[in-house]
């Protein structure tokens, strides 16, 4: 699977002209390679016939269905990076308090 990589300028356009937090960019690159249409690697399998675990993680920040529904409402299936970033920011603020703290957690646990 190949992911699209976005430039800083493209990320700012996608996030409504607001510069994306550097820690958010770091997490996004590690979760999906920056692709707002990325499905979870394990859900898709490894490409060698191995079945995945059917995770509902999706999008640039790999949020699961229930989390996307909670923070995105009826737009939970949106591939709009701005909407995904906004929802992920709300999730991160509530769970960790900041993107920096979420990044530190990710580095320790390889998920957030």
Regions found by a protein language model. Give the residues of each.
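Active-site micro-motifs of SAM-dependent methyltransferase domains
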Residues: 13, 34, 70
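Generic structural signal for alpha-helix termini and adjacent loop/cap motifs
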Residues: 9, 17, 30, 94-95
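Catalytic and binding regions of secreted/periplasmic enzymes and modules that target cell-wall glycans
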Residues: 58-112
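Short, functionally critical alpha-helical segments immediately adjacent to catalytic or ligand/cofactor-binding
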Residues: 20-45, 85-90, 103-107
């Amino acid at each position: 699977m190949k992911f699209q990589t976005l430039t800083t300028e493209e990320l700012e356009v996608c996030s409504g002209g607001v510069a994306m937090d550097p820690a958010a960019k770091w997490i996004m690159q590690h979760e999906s390679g920056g692709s707002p249409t990325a499905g979870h690697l394990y859900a898709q399998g490894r490409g060698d016939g191995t079945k995945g675990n059917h995770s509902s993680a999706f999008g640039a920040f790999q949020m699961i269905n229930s989390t996307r529904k909670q923070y995105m409402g009826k737009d939970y299936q949106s591939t709009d990076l701005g909407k995904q970033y906004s929802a992920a920011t709300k999730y991160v603020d509530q769970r960790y308090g900041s993107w920096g703290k979420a990044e530190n957690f990710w580095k320790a646990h390889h998920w957030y």
